[in-house]
């Protein structure tokens, strides 16, 4: 694996000079191998190690290099034709392979090659970009989007129209992460490498970026870029220091543990916030 990484790192340093016409065989094979490993879930752009999320930047570099080494080509779909550098993940799937991998794909859901979809996942008409990782038992609902390199945990529900932001550049930026057993309400947006920790519930229409204040009404603490585990979050506002105006924020209205969450429905958690 180190040899593969070295090839990617070296090629990335001279990426401005690489074209589909002049790319060498070693680089092309290395990039294609990484995309294949991302596609199968054998590698992932970010993973939790000793309780901390670690981003493997060299894998992002491989994804970016894939755009340098490939020309646009016609991609045939059931409803239309497309013209892009990245093939669709399911272009060569037959019924046996869908059965083996054990997920459902409802038309016209679109997944780019290099994204991993785990068993027991359901993809309603939605979009999953290259480098993303969608773990077991997750529902990606209608018109939801999972951006490039985003990491979605087990048993997550991404409701209708949810946007999970992608990140390829700048390289130092971390991917957006939704940990296990989270619920993201309809039309919410989680972007810019925000981490929603395990068991959290995000209400409909909540917008979370790195600059969004995430206010815990029980403690008065303000978080940036991270929703603590077990949080129930709704949209809100915080007043300015001079009291003349207020600005948008997200409000943690309560905390729930796994036992409570298992007994109480999502709607009930969001209704009883007073």
UniProtKB/Swiss-Prot annotation:
<feature type="binding site">
    <location>
        <position position="141"/>
    </location>
    <ligand>
        <name>substrate</name>
    </ligand>
</feature>
<keyword id="KW-0457">Lysine biosynthesis</keyword>
<keyword id="KW-0808">Transferase</keyword>
<keyword id="KW-0677">Repeat</keyword>
<dbReference type="GO" id="GO:0008666">
    <property type="term" value="F:2,3,4,5-tetrahydropyridine-2,6-dicarboxylate N-succinyltransferase activity"/>
</dbReference>
<dbReference type="Pfam" id="PF14805">
    <property type="entry name" value="THDPS_N_2"/>
</dbReference>
<dbReference type="InterPro" id="IPR005664">
    <property type="entry name" value="DapD_Trfase_Hexpep_rpt_fam"/>
</dbReference>
<dbReference type="InterPro" id="IPR023180">
    <property type="entry name" value="THP_succinylTrfase_dom1"/>
</dbReference>
<keyword id="KW-0220">Diaminopimelate biosynthesis</keyword>
<keyword id="KW-0012">Acyltransferase</keyword>
<comment type="subunit">
    <text>Homotrimer.</text>
</comment>
<dbReference type="GO" id="GO:0009085">
    <property type="term" value="P:lysine biosynthetic process"/>
</dbReference>
<dbReference type="GO" id="GO:0009089">
    <property type="term" value="P:lysine biosynthetic process via diaminopimelate"/>
</dbReference>
<feature type="binding site">
    <location>
        <position position="104"/>
    </location>
    <ligand>
        <name>substrate</name>
    </ligand>
</feature>
<keyword id="KW-0028">Amino-acid biosynthesis</keyword>
<dbReference type="GO" id="GO:0005737">
    <property type="term" value="C:cytoplasm"/>
</dbReference>
<comment type="pathway">
    <text>Amino-acid biosynthesis; L-lysine biosynthesis via DAP pathway; LL-2,6-diaminopimelate from (S)-tetrahydrodipicolinate (succinylase route): step 1/3.</text>
</comment>
<dbReference type="InterPro" id="IPR001451">
    <property type="entry name" value="Hexapep"/>
</dbReference>
<protein>
    <recommendedName>
        <fullName>2,3,4,5-tetrahydropyridine-2,6-dicarboxylate N-succinyltransferase</fullName>
        <ecNumber>2.3.1.117</ecNumber>
    </recommendedName>
</protein>
<dbReference type="InterPro" id="IPR037133">
    <property type="entry name" value="THP_succinylTrfase_N_sf"/>
</dbReference>
<dbReference type="Pfam" id="PF14602">
    <property type="entry name" value="Hexapep_2"/>
</dbReference>
<dbReference type="InterPro" id="IPR011004">
    <property type="entry name" value="Trimer_LpxA-like_sf"/>
</dbReference>
<keyword id="KW-0963">Cytoplasm</keyword>
<dbReference type="GO" id="GO:0016779">
    <property type="term" value="F:nucleotidyltransferase activity"/>
</dbReference>
<dbReference type="InterPro" id="IPR018357">
    <property type="entry name" value="Hexapep_transf_CS"/>
</dbReference>
<comment type="similarity">
    <text>Belongs to the transferase hexapeptide repeat family.</text>
</comment>
<dbReference type="GO" id="GO:0019877">
    <property type="term" value="P:diaminopimelate biosynthetic process"/>
</dbReference>
């Amino acid at each position: 694996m180190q040899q593969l990484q070295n090839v990617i790192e070296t090629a990335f340093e001279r990426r401005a000079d690489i074209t589909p016409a002049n790319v060498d065989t070693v680089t092309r094979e290395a990039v294609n191998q990484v995309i294949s490993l991302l596609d199968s879930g054998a590698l992932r752009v970010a993973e939790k190690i000793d309780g901390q999320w670690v981003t493997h930047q060299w894998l992002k570099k491989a994804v970016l290099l894939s755009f340098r080494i490939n020309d646009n080509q016609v991609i045939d779909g059931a409803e239309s034709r497309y013209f892009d550098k990245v093939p669709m993940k399911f272009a060569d799937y037959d019924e046996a392979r869908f059965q083996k991998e054990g997920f459902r794909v409802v038309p016209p859901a679109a997944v780019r090659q290099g994204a991993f979809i785990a068993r027991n996942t359901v993809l309603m008409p939605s979009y999953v970009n290259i480098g993303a990782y969608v773990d077991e038992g997750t529902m990606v609902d209608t018109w939801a989007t999972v951006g490039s390199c985003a990491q979605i945990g087990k048993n997550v529900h991404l409701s209708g129209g949810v946007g999970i932001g992608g990140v390829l550049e700048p390289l130092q930026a971390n991917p957006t992460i939704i940990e296990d057993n989270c619920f993201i309400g309809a039309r919410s947006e989680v972007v810019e490498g925000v981490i929603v920790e395990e068991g959290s519930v995000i209400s409909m229409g909540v917008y979370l970026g790195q600059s969004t204040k995430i206010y815990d009404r029980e403690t008065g603490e303000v978080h940036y870029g991270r929703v603590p585990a077990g949080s129930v979050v709704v949209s809100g506002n915080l007043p300015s220091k001079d009291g003349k105006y207020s600005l948008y924020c997200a409000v943690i209205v309560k905390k729930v543990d796994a036992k409570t969450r298992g007994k109480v429905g999502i709607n009930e958690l969001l209704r009883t916030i007073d």
